[in-house]
Amino acid sequence: MPLFTATELIPKGQRFVALANSQTYSTRTAGAILNEAARAESTARAFDIFLAHAYLDATLVAGLKADIEEMGFSVYVDWIQDSHLDRAKVDKATVELLRMRLKQSTSLFFATSDNSSTSKWMPWECGYFDGAKGKVAICPIAAQGALSEFAGQEYLGIYPYIQKDR
């Protein structure tokens, strides 16, 4: 079975990003209103999957989220559900919010990519979730082509990895 590929995910992610960026027609856009509603709704919501990822892969992650949701799962991505978070100002409130989101999630997918090794949060999220619930899987994103095998960082080898059914 093949892995998720950047070639497939980028167009989906670009559509999401374009839609989010196009909503600038007023000082309080429909997107802002929807984000507020989603934030209020999602504080009590459960998610099937917490998607740990590198923010540098935002377009890929948006496409991956869309792909997984098309399979019928709910997916938490911090900068989508909690767009008010300030990446330049990480504090205790940020950590508490992420802990709450991890607790609200049934499983964690660790999205590996060329950028994932630079993330400071991904190992923390993975370790926290593994200790709390143990339902962690690696979700490799192949840079190109339809690779069918994954070999990741050492400690990631203890987890199963996700393959995409075709």
PLM feature spans:
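Conserved N-terminal substructure of TIR/SEFIR domains
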Residues: 1-104
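Conserved beta-strand segments of the P-loop GTPase G domain that flank and frequently precede/overlap
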Residues: 52, 109-113, 139-140
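Short glycine-/polar-rich loops that comprise or flank the Walker A/P-loop
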Residues: 71, 104-107, 132-136
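Short beta-alpha junction loops
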Residues: 81-83, 114-115, 140-147
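Short low-complexity, flexible loop/linker segments enriched in glycine and/or proline
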Residues: 90-93, 125-126, 152-154
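Extended, charge-rich low-complexity interaction segments
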Residues: 102-116
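Conserved TIR/SEFIR loop-to-helix hotspot centered on a Trp-containing motif
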Residues: 114-132
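Glycine-rich, charge-decorated loop segments at or immediately adjacent to ligand/cofactor-binding or catalytic sites
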Residues: 138, 143-163
